[in-house]
Amino acid sequence: MRKLTCMRMSAKMTILFSVIAACMIAVNSVLATLSEIRNILLYEEDNLNAMASKIVAAFEQNITVMGYALDGLKQDNDFMAALNTIYTLGEDMETTSEYHQAQNTLSAALFHEPLNDYFYRINVLTMDGFYLSSRYETIGLLENYSDELRTVMHRLPYLNERNRGLSQKTLVRPHIDPWFVARRISIYTLMSPAVYHGKQIGFVEVNALSTDLFDIFSSNDMAGFRATAYDADGRLFHRSFDDTIDYSAAEYGSMTECSDKNGDTYYVVKEHCSWL
């Protein structure tokens, strides 16, 4: 069986789109001329590229809105000053009125962030063990300054990258929510260092449910449409179907044939796309 796939590349992410091509009925027909086959393939390629562009735009918009939430907090002078107070005072001063006032300022900003309702939770943290979330939980959250919370923080690779710029946003592929231990919830994260007067004092992150990706990377406009995304390191970011296709033969600017482990042949289009 031959199928159509669109592989769109960016500096950070590879997104693979595929759909079973109805035009293969014509390819297998002795009545179809070579000219007709070529026209059908071009038509299907155009349709798939249009659908891929629509999906990529929706994904980019989703990440951009997450970025707006991050920037809104990081550009809030009161919020950043309060986080700096928490960072400066630390665990030993946790019971002071100054600490409590700073924490209340952070809570008010998190709970009243206009974009809060769009996402699973928005968090702020410092690496010495402070954590605060926009999502109120009565049970299941790790306790501030506890050994358990500090252990989680220091085990998360995306919080410990040494080569990250102070203004850089990092998109983290789907993972189990590390802060909520009552049950396993899969999320994906956009995070950024929190910088106050040129000094990094913590992190701000936006978490969204991984199930949202199925809505973003799906389409009802094309029967059999499926999508898979990989990050810059080739690790799976999202998959809506089992994919064993070997894309090594794919080339820019032309539609090529690739096969999976079952011997099924796919038509592949490889393109660049902007991301964030």
Enumerate the language-model features and the residues they cover:
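N-terminal sensory and localization modules of signal-transduction and trafficking proteins
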Residues: 1-7, 46-47, 214-215, 229-233
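Juxtamembrane extracytoplasmic/periplasmic/luminal helical "stalk" adjacent to the first N-terminal
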Residues: 7, 11-93
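Short hydrophobic alpha-helical segments used for membrane anchoring or interfacial signaling
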Residues: 75, 122-130, 226-237
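Extracellular/periplasmic juxtamembrane segments that couple receptor/chemosensory ectodomains to their
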Residues: 196, 221-224, 232-233, 241-276
